[in-house]
Amino acid sequence: MHFVINDTVKQLLNLLWFCKKVNIPFEVYGFTNDSPSEWRNPDPDGRGGLEEIQVMKENEIYCHPTFRLLNFVSSDSGKDFEEQCQHLFKLSYSLQNGYSDYVPYGFNLSGTPLNETIIALRELIPDFFKKHQVSKLNTVLLTDGESQSISRVNMCPSYYDPNVMQFGRISLHSRCQLRDRKIGRVYHACNEWNWKNSITQTLLQNLEDNFPNCNIIGIRLLQSGEVSRFHYQYKEDENYTDQDKKSWSKTKSAILKPTGYSVLYGIASSRLNESEEFEVKENATKAQIRSAFKKNLKNKSSNKKVLSSFVDM
């Protein structure tokens, strides 16, 4: 991700500017599990280490205490909006160009805790609906890869005293099921190696069932050679056709609709640095801004289909 993080943020800031101009509320979060090693593990006496971020209950999904969601930019920032955007841009520039001395403690790139993020959205989405009084919400999940694995809570003997039982964690397997007592549903698929039966797909499906007025939009950054695997993994028919190849060669983007996502966009990471400025009048209406934004997209050799589709949702 660090090869394209700054280019990705440039695209993000363009989208935020559009939303800001037409008064579309938004929140921008970055997920991370980066933390210094001395924060992670307690000593034999139990001192130090990170506190659990959940009430531990056997057989519930386990979210590691290093997981964090960082709220970088908000539509409610007011006069701080531009400063927040500048901080985000400088951070991404430092990460992409290897200026580690300018990256704050705990803000380096890490794994991909997408599963934990989907779980956290169960609280963020209703809060957003309540705060902004909107009837529909687009939730965008942007990654450069699949989610890292997630565990469940179990009881196990203490490392220091085998006679003492304590909470631990163990990997999910194909016999695990996800039960949502609130809506009365049981999901049978928790296999990590196949999208149709993956825990990520299961969590997304559960999110969609809980919030039917929320579009779950995935954006996946693809490096050279990944597009065929992207199609095989996420297309329901598991078929990468000649038409798919031709479309990718022309637009360097793909639009799929796998179970769990309202829509999933694949974008060539090599094309993210394309940037063209567009201008509108200071007193332009929302319709004029929207028209100028979409007209600008037509001048781009790639990603225009993706961004145009997103604007129309």
Predicted regions and their residues:
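Acidic, glycine-rich A-domain
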Residues: M1-M313
